């Protein structure tokens, strides 16, 4: 199917594994991918390079990058001078939580979608193997869909309202790793680490690295990223 004959979908593409798989799922479902990447002042800016690579590799119809610098607000290890924790995934909301990030990002993606003529929005949030961020939960996604249709011209005047797709929401990281392989994606195209080492290597120890490594290990698949030899062990990894 030619790209110009496919229905457009706005994809929030961070450059991470989840957003890459989400974009490919949208494409598999017949959508033309209009990807939006947001530079929010994150310390792991390497993910922006990954987003560009992913958009090129999957043949996105359009890829737009915008700045929404959240560093001035502070309050997160990803945008402030706060150490990224390396002690494992806990039960509390960690300091890597960026205040209202997905609320901000989905608002921007909705604006991008409306301007692009897209009414389907895809986001790669996950509520199983994740760090406990409140803006990844199903009830947030459901409530935002209502808000998007109340707050936009498209939602008020058109018969086809915005629909928010979160295809990974109820998948484990192992499921997502398997989807990556099934869709023919290279895991090394994506980036997950919050605290990159010199030479742009993943640390292997932050929450995001641990969850990703755990997922590939449980799926029995090799991850294409090069983790340091002294990274904390993950059961089943390299088995």
UniProtKB/Swiss-Prot annotation:
Residues the record lists as binding Zn(2+): 193, 203, 206, 209
CC cofactor note: Binds 1 zinc ion per subunit.
Keyword Ligase among UniProt keywords: yes
EC nos: 6.3.4.20
Any one GO MF annotation of this record: ligase activity, forming carbon-nitrogen bonds
Pfam families (UniProt xref): QueC
Pathway: Purine metabolism; 7-cyano-7-deazaguanine biosynthesis
Reactions accelerated catalytically: 7-carboxy-7-deazaguanine + NH4(+) + ATP = 7-cyano-7-deazaguanine + ADP + phosphate + H2O + H(+)
Entry-linked InterPro entries: QueC, Rossmann-like_a/b/a_fold
Source species, domain of life: Bacteria
Cofactor: Zn(2+)
Keywords annotated in UniProt: ATP-binding, Ligase, Metal-binding, Nucleotide-binding, Queuosine biosynthesis, Zinc
Binding-site residues for ATP, renumbered to this chain: 13-23
GO process terms (BP): queuosine biosynthetic process
Record-stated family: Belongs to the QueC family.
Biological role: Catalyzes the ATP-dependent conversion of 7-carboxy-7-deazaguanine (CDG) to 7-cyano-7-deazaguanine (preQ(0)).
NCBIfam families the UniProt entry points to: 7-cyano-7-deazaguanine synthase QueC
Protein name: 7-cyano-7-deazaguanine synthase
């Amino acid at each position: 199917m030619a790209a110009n004959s496919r229905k457009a979908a706005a994809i929030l593409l961070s450059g991470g594994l989840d957003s890459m798989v989400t974009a490919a799922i949208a494409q598999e479902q017949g959508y033309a991918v209009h990807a939006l990447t947001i530079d929010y002042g994150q310390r792991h800016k390497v993910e922006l390079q990954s987003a560009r690579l992913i958009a090129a590799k999957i043949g996105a119809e359009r890829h737009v990058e915008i700045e929404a610098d959240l560093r001035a607000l502070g309050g997160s290890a990803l945008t402030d001078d706060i150490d990224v924790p390396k002690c494992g995934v806990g039960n509390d909301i960690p300091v890597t939580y960026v205040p209202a990030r997905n609320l901000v990002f989905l608002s921007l993606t909705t604006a991008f979608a409306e301007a692009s003529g897209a009414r389907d929005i895809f986001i790669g949030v996950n509520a199983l193997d994740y760090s406990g961020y409140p803006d990844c939960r199903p009830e947030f996604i459901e409530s935002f869909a209502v808000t998007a249709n109340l707050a936009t011209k498209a939602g008020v005047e058109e018969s086809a309202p915005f629909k928010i797709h979160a295809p990974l929401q109820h998948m484990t990281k192992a499921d997502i790793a398997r989807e990556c392989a099934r869709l023919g994606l290279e895991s090394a195209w994506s980036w997950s680490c919050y605290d990159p080492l010199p030479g742009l290597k993943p640390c292997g120890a932050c929450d995001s690295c641990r969850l990703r490594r755990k997922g590939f290990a449980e799926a029995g698949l090799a991850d294409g990223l090069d983790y340091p030899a002294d990274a904390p062990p993950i059961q089943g990894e390299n088995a």
